[in-house]
A protein has these predicted regions:
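Structural core segment of the AMP-binding/adenylate-forming
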Residues: 71-72, 95, 99-178
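Short phosphate-binding/catalytic loops that engage adenosine nucleotides
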Residues: 74, 78, 102, 209-210
Length: 210
């Protein structure tokens, strides 16, 4: 299931009214970050107790990630699941995806095999960004199980442990490390998406996650 354009849900009159009221604009998420990176580059934007990022650091880091994602063949309109705790990597990844017009599918950290299997299939995600482990749970092992049903699923691991590094070194594992994706070749990025392009698919946190 891939989302359509906003015109599938809103009439032309709705769109004009929202724009006239200033509720809708033409800036993308990355546009807004770029403005802040220029105006307050050294101000801390996010911290998680392990890492902190200023506006400029987030901007530059997201560009490097976006270049790495693009080099992997990820393109506008693709969907990528982001199954991370409240880490700064979550913000980096979502910002990088937004720069490319790739649709973020955030998954709550408490979701397990049944829920993530459904979301990954229903949203037709091509990849997932996940921890190796978090609070005693092995996320990487779970997604390797999902990959048995979806052998094309790419798995990127944030903050890997030694076991995750070893798996990433195995030929054909489908597992890579997020930090290894970063590149400095940001100049080759495609044009930015429109503010009207799909950006996010959110699944409910109800009893079925469906």
């Amino acid at each position: 299931m891939k989302p359509g354009k906003y015109t599938d849900r809103y009439t032309a009159e709705d769109v004009r009214a929202y724009r006239d009221a200033g509720l809708w604009g033409d800036e993308t998420m990355f546009d807004l970050l770029t403005i802040q990176a220029e105006q307050r580059p050294d101000k801390v934007f996010a911290t998680d107790g392990h890492r902190s990022l200023t506006y400029r650091e987030l901007h530059d880091s997201a560009l490097r990630l976006a270049a790495g994602f693009h080099a992997r063949g990820w393109r506008a309109g693709d969907a990528v699941a982001v199954h991370l705790p409240n880490w700064v990597e979550f913000i980096e990844v979502v910002t990088a995806l937004s720069r490319l017009g790739i649709i973020t599918v955030p998954i709550m950290p408490i979701y397990r095999r049944d829920e993530v299997g459904y979301v990954a299939g229903h949203a037709e995600v091509r990849a997932v960004v996940t921890p190796a482990t978090f609070k005693g749970f092995d996320y990487l092992d779970m997604y390797r199980d999902v990959r048995r049903e979806r052998p094309d699923l790419e798995i990127l691991v944030a903050r890997p442990d030694d076991a995750a590094r070893a798996i990433a070194n195995e030929a054909g594992s489908g597992v890579d490390l997020l930090d290894d994706v970063r590149t400095d070749a940001a100049a080759d990025l495609p044009a930015q998406p429109s503010a009207d392009d799909p950006f996010l698919i959110v699944y409910t946190s109800g009893t079925t996650s469906r």
